[in-house]
């Protein structure tokens, strides 16, 4: 690539100095540029000017797994492409295909190989064909990888560069303030060529957290992003991005280095000729979620996480008071930024986003009503040793068959 873009180089070095103050920013910046614009590919001469031309009220996304449609004869991605062309084209212009890589658990979010499409679904050419017709969203699962993948196997064997790819903790460290999305132990002891190690597992013990202290991890993620873009992905969902940087003795969520990494990704995307939108998946209270706009320097879009639980509460309780109060208090998105409104997702309905919006007794009544309708609730560990509801795991239509007062006789 042509590395003569002074503004891009200078801004990139500024961010890398924030993330890796003890490493040579000039060398790192050169590596970043060579990875993101390899060979004869070059960035734009100027960054894309912030505007709202990237989306409008007419944009809509279908969320689906790659194998939602099966017939025993065709590849699932072939079936999905046919379904989209027949029934969705003209009504929705985007599709979010949940992780389509080989995986070991968590419905795709424990990736074993980032470079391949799950052969049970199809191949990269199938992804590219869907992207030719729709705005395609993919998941960048960047906080963790599968314990059964090649990267972690190489780590356990002590083979470079993977021997430095995973975040190791010490049971004696002060981890009391770490914000958790799960109740499982944070550290997992594993056997390696050099003895036992304790690796960090923010989610499950099959999902081992990557070590972004090592710039090679960031560079590898940039290679993966480039591969997504080259195959037609135009919306990058940054899965669990809030947890990627760790510092014992802190909350280990939303740290300044995390925000600097999101800013770096935004910078690179704004210099691509392809129109790439960054969407952060931050299932947290409102102010924390909005921080990922970063004054127009971070995400192009954030999920409007309070919307699903507040809609559910309004339907169950018969009052839109809390939904209305929240809507009235929401700041408009800044120029070049947007809220992604949604009613439910593969993750369920988050409870953290209504902290400070629903009184605890209203939240608890909503949860109890959902449980009566057959929902499940996943919990998260709190620093004081107790647990709190994290997500309602349910179908939106099923959970709405009960209200605070009775069963809905007209439910279908």
Predicted ranges, named:
Residues 2-412:
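Active-site and adjacent substrate-binding regions of carbohydrate-active enzymes
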């Amino acid at each position: 690539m042509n590395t003569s873009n002074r503004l891009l180089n200078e801004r990139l070095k500024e961010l890398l100095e924030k993330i890796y103050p003890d490493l040579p920013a000039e060398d790192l910046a050169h590596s970043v540029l060579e990875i993101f614009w390899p060979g004869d590919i070059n960035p734009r001469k100027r960054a894309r000017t912030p505007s709202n031309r990237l989306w409008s009220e007419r944009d809509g996304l279908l969320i689906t797994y790659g194998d939602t449609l099966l017939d025993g004869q065709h590849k699932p991605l072939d079936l999905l492409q046919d379904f989209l062309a027949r029934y969705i084209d003209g009504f929705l212009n985007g599709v979010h295909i949940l992780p389509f890589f080989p995986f070991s658990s968590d419905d795709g979010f424990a990736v074993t190989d980032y470079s391949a499409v799950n052969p049970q679904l199809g191949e990269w050419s199938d992804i590219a064909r869907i992207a030719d017709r729709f705005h395609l969203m993919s998941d960048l699962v960047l906080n963790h990888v599968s314990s059964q993948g090649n990267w972690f196997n190489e780590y356990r064997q002590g083979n470079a560069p993977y021997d430095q790819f995973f975040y190791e903790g010490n049971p004696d460290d002060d981890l009391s303030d770490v914000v958790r999305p799960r109740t499982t132990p944070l550290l997992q002891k594993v056997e390696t060529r050099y003895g036992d190690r304790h690796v960090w597992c923010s989610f499950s013990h099959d999902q081992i957290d990557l070590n972004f202290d090592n710039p090679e991890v960031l560079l590898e993620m940039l290679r993966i992003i480039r591969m997504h873009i080259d195959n037609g992905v135009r919306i990058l969902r940054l899965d669990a991005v809030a947890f990627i940087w760790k510092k014992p003795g802190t909350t280990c969520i939303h740290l300044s280095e995390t925000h600097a990494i999101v800013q770096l990704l935004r910078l690179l995307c704004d210099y691509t000729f392809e129109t790439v939108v960054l969407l952060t998946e931050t299932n947290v209270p409102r102010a924390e979620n909005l921080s990922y706009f970063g004054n127009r320097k971070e995400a192009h879009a954030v999920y409007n996480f309070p919307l699903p639980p507040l809609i559910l509460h309004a339907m169950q309780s018969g009052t839109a008071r809390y939904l209305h109060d929240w809507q009235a208090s929401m700041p408009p998105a800044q120029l070049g930024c947007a809220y992604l409104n949604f009613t439910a997702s593969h993750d369920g309905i988050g409870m953290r986003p209504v902290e400070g919006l629903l009184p605890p007794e209203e939240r608890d009544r909503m949860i109890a009503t959902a449980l009566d309708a057959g929902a499940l609730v996943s919990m998260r560990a709190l620093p004081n040793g107790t647990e709190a509801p994290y997500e309602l795991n349910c179908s939106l239509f099923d959970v709405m068959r009960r209200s605070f007062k009775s069963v809905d006789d007209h439910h279908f």
